Amino acid sequence: MTDAATNPLLLESTLPYGLPDYRQIRPEHYLPAFEAAFAEHRREIENITRVRSMPTFENTMVALEQSGDLLGRVARTFYTVSSADATAQIQEIDEALAPLMAAHQDAVQLDGQLYGRIRTLHDRLADLALDPEQRYLVERHYREMTHAGAGLDDTQKERLTELNQRLSVLTTTFEKNLLADTNDLAVVFDDAAELDGLTEGELSAAAQNAADRGLNGKYVVTLTLFTGHPYLSSLTDRESRRRLLEASRSRGARGNEYDNRAVLREIVRLRAERASLLGYDSHAAYVTSDETAGSPEAVHALLRRLAVPAARNARAEQEALQRIVDAEAEPFALEAHDWAFYTEKVRAAEYDLDRTALRPWFEAERVLQDGVFRAATALYGITFTEREDLPAYHPDARVFEVHNADGSPQGLFILDLYTRDTKRGGAWMNSIVSQSRLRGTLPIVVNNLNVPKPAAGQPTLLTLDEVTTLFHEFGHALHGLFATVTYPHFAGTAVFRDFVEFPSQVNEMWILWPEVLAAYARHRETGEPLPQEVVDKLHASEAFNQGFATSEYLAASWIDQAWHALDAHAAAEVTDVAAFEAAALADIGLDNPAVPTRYSSTYFAHVFSGGYSAGYYSYIWSEVLDADTVEWFRENGGLTRENGDRFRERLLGVGGSKDPLEAYRDFRGRDADIAPLLTRRGLDA
């Protein structure tokens, strides 16, 4: 235990914007801080429910929004670290915390007295003199508590609490297993010749990975979150490609202590039982009922509509790849581990474009400063100043202060670029502090990526995919930074799951925008800009390989939907995870063995340990809005302050304070049109 008077998590930070002083925080501070924060939040809720007077917006909704400040501060501080630097000690805390957090959340969300007060306000909405944000706050809290089960009887609530606590343990276990198995499956190569095709920097990084593991003289390639590893596009040795892909696909399914198959089957079964308890046919029905999609049927209709042309295009792409293979001295039947490598050969033949050779033009610092930041300055007038005096949670994480054009402060942005064994896979954005006029706070947002760290003294050269990820995650960061809401419940990215990817996807449009690209895509040695003919080829090849890209994404989305369409009885009958996946993919026609799903279930962190259960469709759902918005920018002059201000004020700034599709109509002037998405992905032919 630590003394509350000296626990830095229980003291107001004296740093700018309320940034936690990570220099003072030790692992042993976290659990005592959570215990104190849980207790304080319970007292705050009791103070609301003990009020004897009639519920008013002030004594119920405002009081509720002001509650939980300490808990939110402690939780955001901890979960930032547990995702990005999960040492063994942090993982132990995470496991111990999971059931405690679930129990506390249930105690609040299922509080009958609190629910009764909010329901009274909801029933009287027509008689209350509230502004639109206040009305929507009442509606959302009522909807969310109902959705969580606040209207159930005591026996049902008891079972619901048991389910939620068990699920919190299982999802934490899934993530812990995945991190451990991913590290365990890093592929060891004895000879540099096996890694022919990698750049000098990539080879040096592999040698350093081996040295870090006590394997001097060898080479270690660590796995990424996706099934397909970026190195598959450049490794010339077919056996090396096969080993890398097989290692990736075996995660969580090897019969060892990190096997996730039983874990995920129990997750599916308990989610289905919970959905039934709450009055829904399936977990997918439960989730989508409170999203813009509205129902699983709407999701399935979109996925099936896209799957047919995507699979057709993938087959055509496969035939083109096979022709390249057949022309070689020793032809063979193309397999999944060959796709990316021969895709680059076809790209080179058809477009005279070698994407792997572009990295010298994408030096990370230049991409950040002259690309990501420069585009944001042009659109929104904001500027960025690095604050090396402010501590982040890890030495690799960098802190930037953000100001508006008039000099007013907007918040802090933290970038944590590099991969490490203690960081979970993928890329993400999270908030350490959320904006709120009520609380007088400005945001602190974090972007995490998993770019391999180069050897000491070497530059960080990005792939085009990594450049895309950087722009994408910064789109989320802008959503968090630009929040202009009164109530913390609505801050930044606190929007429907199938809407949240929309702003981040829109930010990707500036990657190849002429004045942005010309500023950041410069050769690291000569300073020469990326040649115009290469830029033209990048544009010409934008729809290239989209059959594969769309199919592998849709396959993962469909697996997610298939699991979460099951009722509890059907879920209990599934014993073979691989067979279930295969049947699901055959059902939608995405069972081409040369096009593996982006994630298999045993390492599908988004849906079994993240917030995307029954919601992985959100990326393509949001992309309908994104593609339509990109058309709007192009029609209205592109990268201008006027356009940026409109997007900021009508979409990014409102956060979750109004219905997202209403906000979209306010920005666009109409509902989104699917045609731009179909054209972008080559699905309209």
Give a label for each model feature.
Residues 1-199, 633:
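N-terminal helix-rich structural modules
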Residues 2-32, 36, 218-220, 349-351, ...:
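C-terminal, non-catalytic "cap/extension" segments appended to globular domains
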Residues 14-29, 78-97, 120-162, 222-262, ...:
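Short His/Asp/Glu-rich catalytic/ion-coordination signatures at enzyme active sites or charged loops
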Residues 39, 43, 47-54, 70-87, ...:
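Intrinsically disordered or highly flexible coil/loop and linker segments, enriched in small
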Residues 69-80, 139, 143, 339-347, ...:
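Short, hydrophobic/amphipathic alpha-helical patches that form generic packing surfaces
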Residues 133, 137-139, 166-169, 176, ...:
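Active-site-proximal, well-structured secondary-structure segments within enzyme catalytic domains
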Residues 260-272, 444-447, 485, 654-656:
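Short, hydrophobic/aliphatic alpha-helical segments
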Residues 452-471:
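Short pre-active-site segment immediately N-terminal to the catalytic Zn-binding motif
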